[in-house]
Amino acid sequence: MDMSLVFFSQLNMCESKEKTFFKLMHGSGKEETSIEAKIRAKEKRNRLSLLLQRPDFHGETQASRSALLAKETRVSPEEAVKWAESFDKLLSHRDGVDAFTRFLKTEFSEENIEFWVACEDFKKCKEPQQIILKAKAIYEKFIQNDAPKEVNIDFHTKEVIAKSIAQPTLHSFDTAQSRVYQLMEHDSYKRFLKSETYLHLIEGRPQRPTNLRRRSRSFTYNDFQDVKSDVAIWL
């Protein structure tokens, strides 16, 4: 059987090219190559599938944010209606806090309710060491400058907390908590009652994703200092 001679201008070829030429000339290993190709293709599909499932691949899209509103809830429409009676009534119900938190996440201001909840939990501490550790954690997360979830409170209140954080008490965050409470009550809470998140609950309908709104202007406590709350402030 005649075999064609093949000449190469370059004698120093990479190993992969030599292997490819060897297989082409001898015609062997075709079946094995086909199987390996299928395996490699499957592995690529699996890697791509995993990549597409990563949140950081897509970024924080509107769909992923709005999906938070579709979270299943077991609250009855009758119970949800009571949340409109007062902000205090909403916060006294776990499902109310959950629904309000999901709403605030669509406005990128969930740090307010998270701080309020953290303060409520902090006031239940019994052991001195636990008080110190939790106070420090709250301060670093919500109060200090450039905190990861810094709440919008006045400079004087921040200074008072900063000076007392070395020897905290169960009342160290009372003033800041009441400020944040009033901000939510007179701002976010009113929008929540008009939102699809809440309207779907009182109508007993499944929630659906809604268009996101950009973060609203950050109000300060001074914006509401002349407004008197009709419910008890958390002190």
Curated annotation (Swiss-Prot):
The record's listing under InterPro entries reads:
RGS, RGS_sf, RGS_subdom1/3, RGS_subdomain_2
Species assigned in the record: Mus musculus (Mouse)
Family matches, as PROSITE patterns: RGS
Q: What is this protein called?
A: Regulator of G-protein signaling 18
Phosphoserine-modified residues are 49, 216, 218
Described function: Inhibits signal transduction by increasing the GTPase activity of G protein alpha subunits thereby driving them into their inactive GDP-bound form. Binds to G(i) alpha-1, G(i) alpha-2, G(i) alpha-3 and G(q) alpha.
A Pfam family name for this chain?
A: RGS
GO MF entries: GTPase activator activity
Give the UniProt entry's GO cellular component terms.
cytoplasm
The SS bond pairs are none
Give the PANTHER family listed for this entry: REGULATOR OF G PROTEIN SIGNALING (PTHR10845), REGULATOR OF G-PROTEIN SIGNALING 18 (PTHR10845:SF155)
In which domain of life is the source organism classified?
Answer: Eukaryota
UniProt-annotated location(s):
Cytoplasm
Where in the body, by tissue, does this protein show up?
A: Expressed in bone marrow, spleen, fetal liver and lung. At very low levels expressed in heart.
Using the UniProt record, give the first listed, main subcellular location. cytoplasm
Domain RGS, which positions?
A: 86-202
Q: Which GO BP terms sit in this record?
A: G protein-coupled receptor signaling pathway; negative regulation of signal transduction; regulation of G protein-coupled receptor signaling pathway
Taxonomic lineage: Eukaryota, Metazoa, Chordata, Craniata, Vertebrata
Keywords for this protein: Cytoplasm, Phosphoprotein, Signal transduction inhibitor
